């Protein structure tokens, strides 16, 4: 087994699927760690091509020889809720002004999508986490 490479950095970014390019925020974040920016952009775009239209968080691990690996996460719950509710953004005053409604079925569907990234034992707990996110955005769950 080859010796383990030493990790020099961990970068977390949220990028539109299939649309990574060297412009900010991607370029400067990767440039600081000496990563080949175009190589990452091509690999990320290829990996997320099927999910166009979503924001896909990515965790990039940079090694001392300037190589890197990356792990894709599920889209942020807030973005999935906005899409389900059909509104462009959440409420400025979530506890006073409600902007939309989503059903429990939609919340459960989002929880299914996000299950691997959530700290929940079962789908009901995951749905409660998503419902809490909805509440803090001014979206009513029925």
Curated annotation (Swiss-Prot):
Gene: rplK
PTM section of the record: One or more lysine residues are methylated.
PROSITE patterns for the chain: RIBOSOMAL_L11
One GO CC term, this protein: cytosolic large ribosomal subunit
Organism per entry: Mycolicibacterium gilvum (strain PYR-GCK) (Mycobacterium gilvum (strain PYR-GCK))
Function noted in UniProt: Forms part of the ribosomal stalk which helps the ribosome interact with GTP-bound translation factors.
Name of protein: Large ribosomal subunit protein uL11
Family: Belongs to the universal ribosomal protein uL11 family.
Complexes and interactors: Part of the ribosomal stalk of the 50S ribosomal subunit. Interacts with L10 and the large rRNA to form the base of the stalk. L10 forms an elongated spine to which L12 dimers bind in a sequential fashion forming a multimeric L10(L12)X complex.
